[in-house]
Each structure stands twice: as C-alpha cells, then as structure tokens.
Design a protein with these regions (language model features):
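Residue-level preference for non-acidic, small/hydrophobic
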Residues: 87-94, 128, 153, 238, ...
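Active-site SXXK
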Residues: 80-105, 336
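Short, well-structured active-site flanking segments
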Residues: 96-123
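Structured C-terminal helix/loop/strand segments within mature extracytoplasmic catalytic/sensor domains
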Residues: 21-40, 223-235, 239-379
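C-terminal motif of bacterial Sec signal peptides marking the signal peptidase cleavage site
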Residues: 17-18
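A short, well-structured edge-of-sheet supersecondary motif
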Residues: 36-74, 336-338
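Active-site-adjacent helix/loop patches that line small-molecule binding or acyl-intermediate pockets
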Residues: 24-36, 48-49, 116-255
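Sec-dependent signal peptide recognition
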Residues: 2-10
C-alpha cells in the first residue's frame, strides 16, 4: 500500500462546519457569501464573470491523505480560456520526458532552431513559474509536441485536456515543431527531429464563443470571439495535475508522473519561488506578481511562512489560478483552482479588461476568506 492512500470524498456527502464550527455550511459558499466588497463586486454580477472554483481541503488520517473538494459552478462543458495555466502541464511533461532520455537532464543546454536564445530546461521551467514567460513555455512545446504533451497528461488521469498551440507566438498553432539544437557536451551538439502533431479539431463546448466583438489586427469584427481551436484545460484537469504534483503518493502508481526525486524537488521549488529570489527587479516583479490568491492585490512582500505553489494565467480577459497554499507556521494547507472573466465591454483583443479592478482583487479576497476558514477548521 502506498504511503498515502487517496480517499475520494465529495462535498455533497459531507457535513462541513463553517468557520465557527457551528453550522453545516459549505465553506466555499460561506466564503462567497462574504459581505466584503471585493467578493460582492463579482457575486452580485455573477453571470457576466463565468466564475468556476474548486476549493480542496486536505486532511491527514494515519497514513492516508484525504482530499475533499468543494465546487462552485465547475463544469468541464463550460469553456474558459486557460491562458498560461497551460504551462504547468508543459513543465511536468518535460520533466517526465527528460527522465526517459539518458543523454539529457535539467541542466542540458539547447536552443530552438532559428532562435538565438540559448537556455536550459531548468531555466525554462523556472521562468515559467516565476514570471510566466511565454517564450520559455514555447521552447518546451517544441521539445514535446502537442500530441505527446496531451498523451502524458491523459495517461496519468489529468483530463480532460487539449493543448493545441503555443502562447503569444507567430504560427502558434503550427502542428510541426521546430528542431532543438542540444549540447551533448561543450563541443558536441545534436539536432532533434521535427514532430508532426495532429491538427486540432474545433471544441464543441458551451461558451466557446464569447462576447459581442473582437479585434483582428486593427480591425473590429462585430461577432463573438471563437475559442474553438484554443487550448482547453478545465478546472477538473488543473486540480488533478496539482494534486498529483504535490501529493504523488496519494495516487496509484499508474497515475503518478515518472519524475525522479531531483526533478520533483526542483519542480516544487520552482512553483513557490518568488521573482525577486531569482534576481528579477522587485519593483516590476514583486512577490505576488504571479500569486493571485491572498496576495495578488498588493505589492507588499509576502510573509515567509506562507508558500504558494501555483500557476496563474491571464489573457482574453480571463484570470485563472491553480494553487496549493501552505502555512508552515500554523500547519495549514489547502488548494484552490479558480477562474473569472473580466471583460465588461464584451470586446476581445482590445486590452480593456478589469484584471486589476475586479478580477485579481476577487481572487485575492477569495484566498483570504478560505485561509481564515482553514485557520479555524477542526482537523
């Protein structure tokens, strides 16, 4: 039997106490019922924001981990654009593929053919989590190919998922990857073969067309924006990957990613390391630059005893965060995966989104509400 044995529990079958342990309230509903204006600003106009949230309680019982999920409007059939959260699967799949190739490791130097930037796999993964670097992600997609990336996720139970394109790149949906020039040592290089992937088919989901208009280059098109060929990575899949990353032993062997201990330690370190710790300018890349829950609406330093292992995404007016939050001082840990649309004018690609005014403050306060609940929750 694994060290940790997963026990699947659904919120619907549980009697869960509120913060004061005096009622059977759903704690997520309790948080969303807050009178805080940062919460009310969204909850009072819920339909326009397409909110989906999964809050996961974590309990330890003898040698078992118990996950208890509480969902709000979570539905894999209701599409949202995952943006940079799709970099998380790319990072994990890259580590697993590296573990299968004897001549490569995290510190192997390489560059993409036609690109002047020489890097390492470790640097790409660090940049993905610290500042959500698009180019770093795209280099990993060239290494993997879309088909292999998706297969690796599905094989481990991370589903549904369909990563179809690179991010913020010309020909982002090109099905043929670019070769990588890899340094086998200081004087010897090898060139990988291009990978031909399966062309993406249009997604048949609700809310796949959004808004009332969009800009194509500099031209305003008076029609909903069509996301049917975009990446698809819903809340359920994001939660599944996060759980398998933080608590691999809670899953059967066939659902664990094949990472060695060095790789796993590196991944976890990358997920919680703050930008200034990697040498980024703290004025621009402050502690909570890509930590939306609890701290996203402040540029103040984050407390040392709270670590957030996460991946955010923001594009097309959609904010998403997938996070494991750990308070080592108070022995509290929990997970939140949430997404919100903030595009009040209904026009996409106009760069007029309410990220800072509505979206990030909502996610930050949601994190604070659930954190306060966790501090008082009986275990």
């Amino acid at each position: 039997m694994p060290m940790w044995t997963r026990i699947a529990l659904t919120a619907a079958t549980l009697l869960t106490m509120s913060c004061k342990e005096v009622s059977n309230e759903n704690p997520l509903e309790h948080a969303l019922a807050s009178e805080n204006p940062l919460i009310r600003n969204v909850m009072d106009h819920l339909k326009e924001h397409e909110v989906q949230i999964r809050y996961t309680q974590i309990d330890r019982r003898n040698d078992s981990i118990v996950f208890t999920d509480f969902d709000f409007q979570v539905d894999a059939e209701n599409y949202f654009y995952p943006a940079s959260t799709a970099k998380f699967p790319a990072a994990v799949a890259t580590l697993e593929k590296l573990n299968e190739i004897d001549s490569l490791d995290l510190n192997t130097r390489f560059y993409v053919e036609g690109d002047s930037v020489e890097t390492t796999f470790a640097k790409c993964i660090s940049e993905i989590f610290a500042v959500s670097d698009n180019a770093a992600n795209n280099r990993l997609v060239e290494f993997l190919g879309q088909d292999d990336l998706n297969r690796r996720m599905l094989r481990r139970g991370v589903a549904p998922i369909r990563i179809a394109h690179r991010l913020s790149a010309p020909n982002a949906d090109d099905v043929t990857t670019k070769p990588l020039v890899i340094y086998l040592n200081d004087s010897t290089t090898a060139v990988t073969e291009s990978i031909i992937n399966t062309p993406a088919k249009p997604l048949q989901l609700k809310y796949i067309k959004k808004g009332r208009a969009f800009y194509a280059e500099d031209s305003l098109q008076m029609a909903p924006f069509d996301f049917s060929l975009k990446n698809y990575y819903p809340i359920q899949a994001q939660s599944a990957l996060l759980k398998r990353t933080i608590f691999p032993e809670a899953f059967p062997k066939e659902e664990r990613f094949n990472l060695n201990q060095t790789q796993r330690d590196f991944l976890l370190e990358a997920m919680h390391t703050l930008p200034p710790q990697l040498g980024y300018d703290p004025e621009e890349f402050y502690d909570s630059y890509v930590k939306f829950f609890m701290f996203g609406d402040s540029t103040d330093p984050m407390p040392d005893h709270i670590k957030i292992y996460n991946k955010v995404g923001y594009a097309y007016g959609t904010l998403t965060d997938c996070a494991y939050i750990q308070d080592t001082q108070n022995q509290v840990d929990f997970m939140i995966v949430a997404t919100i649309l903030v595009n009040s004018d209904g026009i996409f690609n106009d760069d007029a989104y309410e990220y800072d005014e509505v979206g990030i403050p909502f996610l930050a306060q949601l994190g604070r509400e659930l954190y306060q609940y966790e501090l008082q929750r009986k275990r």
